[in-house]
């Protein structure tokens, strides 16, 4: 969706891009496909972009992932354990190692509906 939106904003025909209709199922597969010449470009993680030779990584935006849970489950033991893990320094260090993610809200409840 991100790539489609950027292509649309630039007024580019997506089918003029080599490999546009091909899907990959991991960031490593994405980077490898571009490196082999199987696609002109792809959306992938910074970490894989830096690990695979002969490709460039151009940041498009920071990315966040949110955990969605029912409000009535927030006081259940499994959620408290999960939040302890998410808020731990070890977990945050692992996420930082992935690169390219906005971790400023990690472990915070940002919205309750």
Curated annotation (Swiss-Prot):
The organism's place on the tree of life at top rank = Bacteria
Q: InterPro entries of this UniProt entry?
A: PBP_domain (IPR024370)
Similarity-based family: To M.jannaschii MJ0886 C-terminal region.
In its UniProt entry, what is this protein called?
Uncharacterized protein in ferredoxin 2Fe-2S gene 5'region
